[in-house]
């Protein structure tokens, strides 16, 4: 029940190195693996699972490995039994019941006489009770497919279980069933996730940071506390190093000025004393050499202080929080920005909402969380609110002003435009200086503002999109967000939270991320389920 990676290196076919000489081990228990997007978390899981070959080094897993990737390799025509890997055993059991007692049948069955009962128990545990084993995947929701994939891995009883973002497509109920299932897993569990509720159920956190794996005992909250404390120390060290550098520079300048004054006075004294030129020259050389030695001492002190500052700055993480002021997004408390009554719509021949429709009114700077099971119609309702989809029945009224949408795909910006060009297109009346200042608030500085959108990392794309949405002309009075944290790393989630907390308009957010919803000050909870839209007191 362990994973041992020794001197592991991996490079892509174009020779771009992802990590080098990585060594670590993970034993029994639950380990959460965290890192910024692009650091190589998913690739590391694929290396451990044997799907990728390392450029150098070795991976040794003690026991059978179960692996649930982020993108599941299932086709729509597969049956539930095929995904669970039990179809051959079920066929053999059926053949035995029909009188076939061949060695091949008994070999196929092996010890799995109770495979159907165990399979159904595992499916029931993950909320898939009543799911027929011959049902095709094409008829299941994305969340059901993920839960089925996890059931398949747990059914194998692996010694090592690798999960890559297992909660991404799960609604709240399915997430909690997954949490419970993993709580009872007794092998070596390694999970890549940005789900902070799941990470808080881990025994330890492994962080892939600057090409190394660093382990932190305890759950994600304990890890965050440790990192925050270290960052506070690093910030203090930077301040001290900056002050020391200023002191050393000042002292060097003062020493140079004193030496210059002494040299000037000495020259005057030598002239007044009428000393021979050879004596006067020696005195001058001695004074210059003494000044040079003193200057070298001060220069070394300045270099040492600069080195200490560089070291202190390297210890500071680039996990900066966005700090914004968004006065133009203010919506008066009494202003109704959207009203919908008797809304009804059908998708795929199925009515999403109750026969009498649903109603929704958004007033003032409300912060609304829209929850409910997958497939209930939450994303469809957002599209009705922003006008990209018209209801089949019912009435809609939108106040004058702009409604902006932010999807989990972050596909709002033109791929060939630079960050600076994107903001200029969104806010053409802003001066160049003002745009540069705003982009700096979103952590875009120097050459980064001239990068095309297509070349941005996931976190950079989020920040660029937020800048263009929040500072667009006119500023949005209503913001719609559909599972905005799904493809973000933990740093980017924190930056999104900061931006939304600065936003002063109304927003409606669809999310199953409980910690995210807690952090953005939701003041109204709505649940869409079985065609009914109802007020609730919390995420459940």
Name every feature range the model reports, one short phrase each:
Residues 150, 178, 466, 485:
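Hydrophobic anchor residue at the start of the ABC signature
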Residues 157:
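Conserved catalytic motifs of ABC-family nucleotide-binding domains
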Residues 200-207, 519-527:
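Conserved catalytic segment of ABC-fold P-loop ATPases
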Residues 74-139, 411-478, 483:
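ABC-family P-loop ATPase nucleotide-binding domains
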Residues 161-165, 170, 406, 478-483, ...:
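Catalytic Walker B motif of ABC-type/P-loop ATPase nucleotide-binding domains
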Residues 5-8, 17-29, 57, 340-346, ...:
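Conserved beta-strand
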Residues 1-11, 89-146, 229-347:
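Coupling and communication elements adjacent to P-loop NTPase active sites across diverse families
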């Amino acid at each position: 029940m362990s994973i041992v990676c020794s001197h592991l290196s991996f490079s892509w076919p174009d020779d771009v190195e992802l990590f080098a000489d990585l060594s670590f081990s993970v034993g029994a228990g639950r380990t959460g693996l965290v890192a910024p997007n692009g650091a190589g978390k998913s690739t590391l899981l694929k290396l451990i699972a044997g799907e990728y070959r390392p450029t150098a080094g070795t991976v040794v897993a003690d026991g059978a490995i179960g692996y649930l990737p982020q993108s599941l390799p299932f086709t729509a025509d597969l049956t539930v039994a095929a995904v669970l890997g039990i179809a051959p055993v079920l066929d053999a059991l059926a053949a035995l019941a029909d009188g076939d007692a061949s060695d091949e049948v008994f070999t196929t069955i092996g010890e799995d006489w109770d495979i159907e009962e165990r399979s159904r128990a595992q499916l029931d545990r993950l909320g898939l009770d009543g799911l027929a084993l011959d049902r095709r995947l094409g008829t299941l929701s994305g969340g059901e497919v993920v839960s089925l994939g996890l059931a398949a891995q747990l059914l194998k009883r692996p010694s090592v279980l690798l999960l890559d973002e297992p909660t991404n497509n799960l609604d709240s109920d399915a997430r909690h069933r997954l949490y419970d299932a993993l709580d009872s897993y007794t092998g070596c569990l390694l999970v890549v996730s940005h789900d902070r509720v799941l990470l808080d159920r881990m025994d330890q956190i492994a962080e892939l940071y600057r090409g190394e794996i660093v382990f932190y005992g305890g759950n994600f909250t304990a890890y965050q506390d440790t990192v925050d404390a270290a960052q506070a120390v690093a910030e203090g060290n930077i301040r001290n190093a900056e002050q020391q550098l200023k002191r050393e520079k000042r002292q060097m300048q003062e020493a140079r000025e004193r030496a210059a004054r002494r040299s000037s006075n000495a020259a005057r004294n030598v002239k007044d004393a009428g000393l021979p030129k050879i004596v006067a020259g020696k005195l001058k050389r001695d004074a210059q050499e003494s000044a040079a030695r003193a200057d070298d001492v001060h220069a070394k002190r300045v270099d040492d202080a600069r080195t200490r500052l560089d070291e202190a700055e390297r210890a500071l993480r680039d996990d900066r929080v966005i700090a914004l002021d968004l006065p133009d997004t203010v919506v008066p408390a009494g202003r109704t920005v959207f009203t919908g009554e008797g809304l009804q719509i059908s998708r795929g021949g199925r009515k999403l909402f109750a026969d009498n429709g649903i109603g929704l009114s958004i007033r003032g700077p409300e912060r609304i969380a829209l929850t409910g099971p997958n497939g209930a119609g939450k994303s469809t309702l957002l599209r009705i609110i922003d006008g990209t989809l018209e209801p089949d029945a019912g009435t809609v009224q939108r106040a004058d002003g702009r409604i902006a949408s932010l999807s989990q795909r972050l596909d709002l910006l033109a791929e060939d435009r630079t960050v600076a060009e994107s903001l200029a297109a969104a806010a053409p009346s802003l001066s160049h200086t003002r745009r540069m200042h705003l982009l700096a608030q979103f952590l875009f500085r120097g050459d980064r503002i001239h990068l095309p959108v297509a070349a941005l990392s996931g976190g950079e794309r989020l920040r660029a999109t937020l800048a263009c949405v929040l500072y667009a002309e006119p500023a949005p009075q209503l913001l719609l967000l559909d599972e905005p944290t799904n493809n973000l790393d933990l740093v980017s989630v924190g930056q999104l939270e900061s931006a939304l907390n600065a936003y002063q308009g109304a927003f409606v957010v669809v999310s199953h991320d409980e910690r995210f919803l807690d952090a953005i000050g939701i003041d109204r909870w709505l649940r869409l389920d079985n065609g009914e839209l109802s007020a609730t007191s919390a995420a459940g």
